[in-house]
Swiss-Prot record:
Source organism: Rhodobacter capsulatus (strain ATCC BAA-309 / NBRC 16581 / SB1003)
InterPro entries, per database record: Periplasmic_diS_OxRdtase_DsbE (IPR004799), Redoxin (IPR013740), Thioredoxin-like_sf (IPR036249), Thioredoxin_CS (IPR017937), Thioredoxin_domain (IPR013766), Thioredoxin_ResA/DsbE_sf (IPR050553)
Protein name per Swiss-Prot or TrEMBL: Thiol:disulfide interchange protein HelX
Record CDD domains: TlpA_like_DsbE
Tree of life domain: Bacteria
GO cellular component labels: outer membrane-bounded periplasmic space
Gene it is expressed from: helX
Length: 176
């Protein structure tokens, strides 16, 4: 009886390793939800990008749901999602932009070319805010409630499908 129990920890460990390997093979960055969901958003630590002051912690706690979008001029998926961000802005959604690991000239050139969907924005060239928020790459978007709590994280571009399935229900207050 003792010999079969001796192998139980090994089997349990093999199960965890197998589950982890399977999860990594899914290639869906959203399969791993943020540990910040339901918690207060980390501090906003940004440098100015252009003449305007960057957004602040107070901007995330003004009673309105907002998107916090991490992006970069060198990021191809950021170009893909950009028209959808412009559409959200036109729908009245406030989007706070965080230019991540980029240069001011390139970031401003990107916005001059593509248009700016951002209500307010700032730069995070040293990845200080990105580390606090758990950003692994761009684009990455967080939905933040009016009290400054993170509702969800979306890794990858905001496609029409992602907006319909993940963002619209949160904005309407009908998400699970």
């Amino acid at each position: 009886m003792a010999k079969p129990l001796m192998f139980l920890p090994l089997l349990v460990m093999a199960g965890f390793v197998g589950a982890g390997y399977f999860a990594m093979q899914q290639n869906d960055p959203n399969a791993m939800p943020t540990a910040l969901a339901g918690k207060e958003a980390p501090a906003v630590r940004l440098e100015p990008l252009g003449a305007e002051a960057p957004f602040t912690d107070a901007d995330l706690r003004d009673g309105k749901i907002k998107l916090v979008n991490f992006w970069a001029s060198w990021c191809a998926p950021c170009r893909v999602e950009h028209p959808n961000l412009i559409g959200l802005k036109q729908d009245g959604i406030e989007i706070m932009g965080v230019n991540w690991k980029d240069t001011p000239d390139q970031a401003q050139g990107f916005l001059a070319e593509m248009g700016s969907p951002y209500t307010r924005l700032g730069a995070d060239p040293g990845n200080k805010m990105g580390l606090d928020w758990g950003v692994a790459g761009v684009p990455e978007t967080f939905v933040v409630d009016g009290a400054g709590r993170i509702l969800t994280r979306i890794a990858g571009p905001l496609t029409e499908d992602v907006i319909t399935k993940k963002i619209d229900p949160l904005l309407a207050g009908t998400a699970d």
